[in-house]
Amino acid sequence: LVKLAQEIIFNQPEILKIISQKQEPLYLENGVFHHNLQSTNELLGESPYILGGKTGLTDRAGGCLLLILKTNQPDEYIVNVILGSKDRFGEMETLNHCALGR
């Protein structure tokens, strides 16, 4: 997952833009608006350090969350991953505070 995040950060700016949005409009090939894709990432917009992320939830894996954070240093990022959680957003908030020293 960290390798995937690195690829997105450094080589896929269009994907980073999409995973940073709370919602993204979806258009048909002919340009007609179809609907808004809604993110399930409750932490988007909660901190200026959160650039984007990916959520996941299955019976087998439980709640999963990957977040990409920007630090105060140029070109320095933190990738936090929570796997198999019953409270992925709460656990991620705690991890983010520790990682950022806040």
Regions found by a protein language model. Name each.
Residues V2-R102:
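Penicillin-recognizing serine hydrolase domain
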